[in-house]
């Protein structure tokens, strides 16, 4: 049976509402996309995000001697790193491909980022054979990734695994553009989670690799927002850090999606790493509630009014001792670097995980 080269679904011309539908006039094309993938490629449209039973799919790899390429989002590492992959794939060897290097400041040395990735993986007892930093957008280090795969695969099957939206399909397309003259863009690419439905095996001269379904991560904030808001939240180019010197009893809004209250501490600097399209707005703590009530979905946008009505906010109070430079991370949004002793109240929406780590930058 012929399959869609975008998602791997079996093509059919009978039911437009079912997976794999294609107009019968197009089904005989050599590189055919189903209607859903066609809409995703041309309009970034996805009317139904499918939650795949990825545990069953990945478990099929357990009985194989394979190499796993685990692709993670450097800007949202902890939310896209999947330590359970080791268990689900039978303890097969793994390479970590840390994508979206281009979003982090160029001033940060690659070795520091690699050490950070290894440290975070080791905390979950996840031992990687190699860590490669990549950018599917700029094609940085794609050659290094392929060379590492060839080195460690040793003739075995290679599986690409990762959460939806980490750039897995874009990485594969980058490999194809660099190493294949015939098929320039055979994997569907979109900002919508869950666009790859089934295994897709691709043969190159020196090795073959298999794309697996993007893991639908229910903790990701993108699952609650429109594509327009997502495009503002997800950085498209190098982050421009915003340094703010704050007195205690000051508040900083990250659009309408997060609120940073400097509750107590001496005057100090905080560095905000978020998408350049998100507003970082400072005000007095005593004025913050009123400002939020007046400006949510206006100045503080995203979220839109419709999105805001469906969001739930929660808060945490965190104390920093100033002994180490730390990151206060809002998964899927960004992070704030804190270097001095202080007390912070952080508020954000359900779906965003609040946690701290040793500073990345």
Show where each model-derived region lies.
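Hydrophobic alpha-helical positions that pack around
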Residues: 169
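Histidine-anchored nucleotide/phosphate-binding helix
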Residues: 80-93
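Conserved beta-strand elements of the Class I
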Residues: 67-70, 159
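Canonical P-loop GTPase G-domain recognition
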Residues: 93-95, 103-166, 177-178, 185, ...
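Helix-rich effector regions associated with P-loop NTPase G domains
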Residues: 2-68, 75, 92-95, 101, ...
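Short amphipathic alpha-helical segments
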Residues: 81-84, 108-110, 221-224
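Switch/connector loops and helix/strand junctions flanking conserved nucleotide-binding motifs
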Residues: 79, 104-108, 142, 218-219, ...
